[in-house]
């Protein structure tokens, strides 16, 4: 009389182990990316906390704050978190730097920047890789070439913090605007023909920019 075989055979065990190995190989990198993004979000949150003070300083003085004491009244080392070493304000550029330990290895000591410029009477903020501003009286920024190794991999940044306008041309689409002269980037809403504006509901989502026309 035949007896039922119980348990796994060697081949079945090897198949199970192989499947577990494949799942681990897929899941581990995904988990590492997730933890890095979560830690970077703290840097963005702390940096964004300085935006209102920097904006207020600019609107009151007409120039960007040169440093932390001028802009946010707190030393860079005092603005920190579990994963963030410091948040520095330099000529209006807010830069957060990750810690060297206790964080995901792919973002150790890495940086990101928030910066703003005046657009049609308002201040518009951007977020992306670390940048610098040569002086407090200008809106222009340049990539921080002193530390390319400090850039955070784009995959660890949220879609709202991947600005690459430096050194490139960015186009906008929206209601009709005018530019006073060919030597400036500034545009204003075309007030001579408000009746010529297309109702927003008839425009695609990619053609509803108002930041440059208010």
Swiss-Prot record:
* Renumbered residue ranges of the record's region Disordered: 182-214
Q: Membrane-spanning regions, if any?
A: 8-28
> Short name of one Pfam family for this protein?
Pilin
List of residues that carry N-methylphenylalanine: 8
Assembly = The pili are polar flexible filaments of about 5.4 nanometers diameter and 2.5 micrometers average length; they consist of only a single polypeptide chain arranged in a helical configuration of five subunits per turn in the assembled pilus.
Q: What does this protein do?
A: Major component of the type IV pilus (T4P) that plays a role in cellular adherence, microcolony formation, resistance to neutrophil mediated killing, twitching motility as well as transformation. Mediates the attachment and the formation of bacterial microcolonies on host epithelial cells. Mechanistically, pili retractation induces host NF-kappa-B activation in infected cells, which is temporally associated with the formation of gonococcal microcolonies.
Under the heading PANTHER family, the entry gives:
GENERAL SECRETION PATHWAY PROTEIN G (PTHR30093), PREPILIN PEPTIDASE-DEPENDENT PROTEIN D (PTHR30093:SF34)
Similarity-based family: Belongs to the N-Me-Phe pilin family.
Protein's name in the database: Type IV major pilin protein PilE1
Species of provenance: Neisseria gonorrhoeae
């Amino acid at each position: 009389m035949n007896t039922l075989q119980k348990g796994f055979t060697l081949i079945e065990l090897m198949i199970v182990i192989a499947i577990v190995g494949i799942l681990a190989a897929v899941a581990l990198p995904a988990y590492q990316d997730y933890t890095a993004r979560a830690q970077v979000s703290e840097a963005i949150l702390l940096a964004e906390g300085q935006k209102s003070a920097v904006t207020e300083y600019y609107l009151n003085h007409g120039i960007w704050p040169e440093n932390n004491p001028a802009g946010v009244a707190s030393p860079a080392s005092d603005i920190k978190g579990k994963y963030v070493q410091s948040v520095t304000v330099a000529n209006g550029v807010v830069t957060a730097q990750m810690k060297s330990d206790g964080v995901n290895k792919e973002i150790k000591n890495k940086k990101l920047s928030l910066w703003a410029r005046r657009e049609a009477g308002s201040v518009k903020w951007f977020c992306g890789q670390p940048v610098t501003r040569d002086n407090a009286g200008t809106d222009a920024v340049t990539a921080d070439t002193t530390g390319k190794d400090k850039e955070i991999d784009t995959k660890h940044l949220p879609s709202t913090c991947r600005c690459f306008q430096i050194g490139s041309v960015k186009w906008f689409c929206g209601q009709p605007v005018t530019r006073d002269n060919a030597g400036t980037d500034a545009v204003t809403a075309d007030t001579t023909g408000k009746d010529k504006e297309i109702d927003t509901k008839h425009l695609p989502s990619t053609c509803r920019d108002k930041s440059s026309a208010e």
